[in-house]
Each structure stands twice: as structure tokens, then as C-alpha cells.
Amino acid sequence: MEVVERKTEMAEEGCTTPRSTMYRIPVASVCPPPPRKKLMVVRKRDPPRNGYFQPPDLETLFYAQPRREACA
């Protein structure tokens, strides 16, 4: 008879939320800091020992056109 009473009590109470610590949401922990950028190692390069290469026909490739005047 006790089994029938328990089922009846459960049916009357309805659904309930579990309250055990096993079912609780854990407390939020502190997030780790964001990753840092790597430091850029800037090293000034020395000019080449033999100097820079200057081809004799460089001006023919990069011809500078004269600027046009605006019409007024």
C-alpha cells in the first residue's frame, strides 16, 4: 500500500528541479588573459658592401611624364 501512496504523492506534486550539488551549474572561474603579440625584433640592415646595383637603362623603364596643368 505504501508504494501506491508514494506514486500518488509524486503524481500530485508534479515535476521538480533536482537540487543536489551534482546537478548544479559550477561557479564560473576567471578567464585566462588574452594571448599577447610577439614583440617585433627590428634590426636595421647595413647597406651592401658593393653598393646598390644601378642598371644603366633604368630611366627608360620609368619615364616620368610631365604634369598637366588644370584648365581654368
Swiss-Prot record:
The UniProt record lists the keyword Cell membrane: no
GO molecular function: protein kinase inhibitor activity
Biological process according to GO: regulation of DNA endoreduplication
Keywords: Cell cycle, Protein kinase inhibitor
Coiled-coil ranges (or none): none
Tissue distribution: Expressed in root meristems after induction.
Keyword Cell cycle: yes
Inducers of expression: Up-regulated by double-stranded DNA breaks-inducing treatments. Up-regulated by DNA damage.
Stated role: Probable cyclin-dependent protein kinase (CDK) inhibitor that functions as a repressor of mitosis in the endoreduplication cell cycle. Acts as a potent cell cycle inhibitor.
Subunit text: Interacts with CDKA-1 and D-type cyclins.
Name of the protein in question: Cyclin-dependent protein kinase inhibitor SMR4
Record organism: Arabidopsis thaliana
Protein's gene: SMR4
